[in-house]
Amino acid sequence: MNKKFKYKKSLLAAILSATLLAGCDGGGSGSSSDTPPVDSGTGSLPEVKPDPTPNPEPTPEPTPDPEPTPEPIPDPEPTPEPEPEPVPTKTGYLTLGGSQRVTGATCNGESSDGFTFKPGEDVTCVAGNTTIATFNTQSEAARSLRAVEKVSFSLEDAQELAGSDDKKSNAVSLVTSSNSCPANTEQVCLTFSSVIESKRFDSLYKQIDLAPEEFKKLVNEEVENNAATDKAPSTHTSPVVPVTTPGTKPDLNASFVSANAEQFYQYQPTEIILSEGRLVDSQGYGVAGVNYYTNSGRGVTGENGEFSFSWGETISFGIDTFELGSVRGNKSTIALTELGDEVRGANIDQLIHRYSTTGQNNTRVVPDDVRKVFAEYPNVINEIINLSLSNGATLGEGEQVVNLPNEFIEQFNTGQAKEIDTAICAKTDGCNEARWFSLTTRNVNDGQIQGVINKLWGVDTNYKSVSKFHVFHDSTNFYGSTGNARGQAVVNISNAAFPILMARNDKNYWLAFGEKRAWDKNELAYITEAPSLVEPENVTRDTATFNLPFISLGQVGEGKLMVIGNPHYNSILRCPNGYSWNGGVNKDGQCTLNSDPDDMKNFMENVLRYLSDDKWKPDAKASMTVGTNLDTVYFKRHGQVTGNSAAFDFHPDFAGISVEHLSSYGDLDPQEMPLLILNGFEYVTQVGNDPYAIPLRADTSKPKLTQQDVTDLIAYLNKGGSVLIMENVMSNLKEESASGFVRLLDAAGLSMALNKSVVNNDPQGYPNRVRQQRATGIWVYERYPAVDGALPYTIDSKTGEVKWKYQVENKPDDKPKLEVASWLEDVDGKQETRYAFIDEADHKTEDSLKAAKEKIFAAFPGLKECTNPAYHYEVNCLEYRPGTGVPVTGGMYVPQYTQLSLNADTAKAMVQAADLGTNIQRLYQHELYFRTNGRKGERLSSVDLERLYQNMSVWLWNDTSYRYEEGKNDELGFKTFTEFLNCYANDAYAGGTKCSADLKKSLVDNNMIYGDGSSKAGMMNPSYPLNYMEKPLTRLMLGRSWWDLNIKVDVEKYPGAVSEEGQNVTETISLYSNPTKWFAGNMQSTGLWAPAQKEVTIKSNANVPVTVTVALADDLTGREKHEVALNRPPRVTKTYSLDASGTVKFKVPYGGLIYIKGNSSTNESASFTFTGVVKAPFYKDGAWKNDLNSPAPLGELESDAFVYTTPKKNLNASNYTGGLEQFANDLDTFASSMNDFYGRDSEDGKHRMFTYKNLPGHKHRFTNDVQISIGDAHSGYPVMNSSFSPNSTTLPTTPLNDWLIWHEVGHNAAETPLTVPGATEVANNVLALYMQDRYLGKMNRVADDITVAPEYLEESNNQAWARGGAGDRLLMYAQLKEWAEKNFDIKKWYPDGTPLPEFYSEREGMKGWNLFQLMHRKARGDEVSNDKFGGKNYCAESNGNAADTLMLCASWVAQTDLSEFFKKWNPGANAYQLPGASEMSFEGGVSQSAYNTLASLDLPKPEQGPETINQVTEHKMSAE
């Protein structure tokens, strides 16, 4: 990157003096974020309490004892003493908040992320050329701190910032905004890619004494929008700083250890932060085709869901601009469900399942068609598809299910979500049904559960051995491939039940214990190439994590109920060695296949023996009668079919078992009939035309068990009988017809309402998926793409140590992602991707295989075959990976079945995943440790904390009513677990426990809940700002409070308490829904507030159903930067369906503004009557509808084109001389200008405006909140902004001089042809440049950098796009506009007599935009003068390469051959680097076929092309 900028150095003085100190063009984004109060953990703070083991100090002076007394005080100077460490050297770390490390700066001349210092000497830290912090370290000389070697210094405690909160706030704001690894949560990277960036930082740091709002505007425009590209769905940075308890030390030897101290030890190869991750769905199957963004780069998840990230950094996942969610990269397997809170996470999982196809090994593949549809709704897609809606049984509540209406799925039946859904389903041959969740963690001692599992798995040598457990796949048929593995979740919801089998979901889940890992514990590939000495470690149970169970066992009285989540296991009873694929029975009753191993026969024998209480044993000549309501078993085979059928019976190998068919269950004797094998429902055997329908799933509308049957069965179980159910229940079991089945399972402490499969496919699939396997051997070249022009790691030739660049530079966001190498080939004029992947099954001869290898070697010169035959996951070479032997099916390479490895270690690890009581107690003790400054409790290691926290979030983040049952074994700790719940829920959970007096006192004493003497008695204290790493139990209960209204949260700080009583209000609401684009939607503000925990009723008089939303707020769950400093509940928004002429009643946990969205195709309104609400300030149609002093804490302004939400005091608008009227007019002017930029001037058709007066109720939305999901602001509906100052009387947004609102709304509106690959954070800013030109007279954003653009293009060797960041790439569009200013005449396209649309401009400085406006219109199919210029619209046609379209469109519209310009920029390209190469390589961009096409048009070359432009046009502004 230095090379890229070297030519800029000579211009620094001019650039800096001209612009840096001038602010942001007279005004800025207005983006403001209150930096949360931070408890500093700086090393300069003296230790509060003595080290508990100070004895080494007085005694270690065995040499003369001249003065043994001076020890208490260091002033006798330690030098006379002969100890080896009189003033021990220590290692310091510059941090934010004591825990978030700052890298890229220097302290005392060394890296700020690990520098040496001697206690007593000052520490001086420099970033760029500016001293940003000085610390006095005298306190570290205390003898009590001798053992503490690692010390964190918080920037906030720097001497330069002492005594000024504004300086502290501004310094943190600048540092976080300058962060070059924005997705990382543990580090902030001050690594400047150019001298320009460094000087910009220096200049701004000198201005930190400005008012925070003014300073923030400077930062937003000068720093944030020059961000490096490809770091996140949005490269915006977050100003949130971790909140830590004062006095903590990042040293494990300290008396008070910080929560994330372990990260300060991660320096060896196995501890390196850079990791390989795997994105999986709720069943543990890899999810391919999802965009992911880290500071280490961006990419698309590989064939098995693989991605690269920096350990501990935030990884953001999305599809195009659709933000699925973010998660902290602290484990090897990231489940979709972890990308949000449990509801949101399950919805993400459902969304991906719905819009994905089935790949190899049941992986999910998001096809390009989904991306293309989403791209039509940039950023606004985030509001159209609401990931926060309740989703029936899809709550990700650990092993618990929240039985809510599936509003998430229902949203696809209306509005723009329906339009998107319809478009995707049409392009992908239909959409899948929804599904469900994932679990991690452990801690249970051996006991009954372990013993039973050992028996059933055959670990107990008295039982039959089971080493490979067979998992059947769904009988769907996509591209000839069978469906995903199906082990439907069977969750234990009380201690009466426990799991029998849970499939692994850790990063190396498909590798058995003892095998070499494919990924290290940081989810990185092992770099084993010479001279590295890294050795892959073995897979062990210590690193195993598990999904929810799909086989569980519950107790009812003396009896046992076992449920297995797939009906095909019945076929094993019929043909125990012929069930896996295309089995069956011939006319003689003989099994047609007999080749399957004995494992599943052994398992079934173990099950039959155990459930019959040894009344039947294999090989023992015992007899047993089994009762059943099954007539038929079905064998798995190819196709969307039920499979070959046979009468339900037992194979002769199960000797002595006879079958009796039952239709009722009264008075059954367990001694005579010890076991029943039942189904709860009829099978679905006819799937019609639905390609996603699963044959043999339970038809919950046709129950086979009546309530009387269930009563009889419970009686039978109570007497000691056993019931085995093998069934696939794909329902949340809300149906009345399912109530009997639900009751039966509930009696045993079980639930199948989770409605998801929980078994991962083996890693097979399309060629672009890393770490995959096929049935036969494969050859694959997997690599890490280059970062900033170099490999992302180095190997020390002497030590063999691997060092990852992102770690050395402290840029966790730069963590690379493993990929299968690919290249583009020109095939018939289209660019097609080829992957460095060979399946030996495709090559029948050695010559054919050799030729395939040679093709790869030719594409990647210097590439060699891998050399270690004992390890099959090497990277940076052509690797051979043996096959699995399991046949794969169809074009998606899905295996016929999945196998799970079972052994004693697996059994042990699995049981340890489910101990709720121990887990919650350990998290409580960890929180006590931090709440008492280390005096009480016990700190968990950060690794254990993450595991326990993630596991408990699965169990707690739902509204499942857990219970403890006396007299039953409680190995899962339900007694302790429910006691904690009752302390927070005011003993709402009836059953065997209540909140004990001792636990309640402890919680009250430690400020976790409010005591009886408080005015807030019965509420929990959310302890904002809340860091889950220090207060995990509080965070877990705060998360649960969204679902469980028995947990009442103190809302005084956020969103604000309302003391007034609710009232009855009737409002008339528009129901009309006809948006041009989703980001200018028809959600209607009511001006009413739903108070927290109070019942609200809404009565509708509308003739159409509507959606009611309370509170517009992002979901922060899993957003790591926010999780360490939450200032509000992570999930706030609630959504309800309200039927036509119906009534809805609800309580919301925290309060919020109420919104209503109708879906009427006609322009109509209806009245709604609200009960229990209070009014909120509401300025609409130029007047106060509800006055400013209304009781709600938030208010809104509604103009013709915008709805603006903000704390009510802001609506005083004291910074606007024209008050709210002027502000509303400015918002509308911006909206109108945006219509102009995109060439939209009509009320219908191709060029329909986003908003206009004849489209009532459809408006852009902009909402301010105390914390938002990503960055200072982000796009969507609404656009969200983190400016939240409840005590300010000023509005934080200035619509006609505000880069932030232009940038974010520009995200929403960005359209082809500007949106090429890599332009996510660029194309939107072209609108902002247009606004600067139109209202400020000059493109200030690019005015300086464009002066050196021609030199940059020469330096970049025709790869300027790939080498540049967002700021550099914006120059391409700016050069094109400035060239068009003098070289493009719009009138040529509008012949005489054709009126020129009014949005075109002849004003100086605006004429160049005419080119862009016409390009936009042409891309939408505008036909004006097409016949005059060749008849073919090159803007509206695509060969699949967006960069080709951009070049051809621009050249055709300009009627000029711009090939030289596009060759120098090569938009759409990206860079990578081969192992050992010293130079970058590039791929993608404009194809040769596009240049050929352009040449064939025979357009004139420009005399001076856009590539020569080095200045912007400046227009002296007058009022427009």
From Swiss-Prot:
Q: How does it sit in the membrane?
A: Lipid-anchor
Q: What is the effect of changing D1498K?
A: In strain: O15:H- / 83/39 /ETEC
* Pfam families (UniProt xref): DUF4092, M60-like_N, Peptidase_M60
Query: What does altering A1519V do?
Result: In strain: O15:H- / 83/39 /ETEC
Note down the stretches annotated as region Disordered.
22-107, 226-247, 1498-1520
**Locate the Peptidase M60 domain: which residues?**
1081-1381
The UniProt record lists lipidation (S-diacylglycerol cysteine) at: C24
Enumerate composition-biased segments (Pro residues). Answer: 51-77
Lipid attachment of type N-palmitoyl cysteine occurs at which residues? C24
Q: Does the keyword Cytoplasm apply?
A: no
Annotated localization = Cell inner membrane
For molecular function, the Gene Ontology terms on record are: transmembrane transporter binding
| Gene Ontology CC entries for this record | plasma membrane
Task: Indicate the secretion signal residues.
Answer: 1-23
Source organism, top-level taxon: Bacteria
Q: What is the effect of changing Q1511K?
A: In strain: O15:H- / 83/39 /ETEC
> Which residue ranges have biased composition labelled Low complexity?
31-42, 234-247
The record makes one more remark, namely:
In many other E.coli strains this gene is part of a type II secretion system, but in MG1655 the locus is missing a number of genes.
Fetch the NCBIfam families from UniProt. Answer: metallo_SslE, SslE_AcfD_Zn_LP
According to its UniProt record, which protein family does this protein belong to?
To V.cholerae AcfD (VC_0845).
Its function, per the record, reads:
Involved in a type II secretion system (T2SS, formerly general secretion pathway, GSP) for the export of folded proteins across the outer membrane.
Name of this protein:
Putative lipoprotein AcfD homolog
Organism of origin is Escherichia coli (strain K12)
Q: Recall the taxonomic lineage recorded for the source organism.
A: Bacteria, Pseudomonadati, Pseudomonadota, Gammaproteobacteria, Enterobacterales
The gene for this chain is yghJ
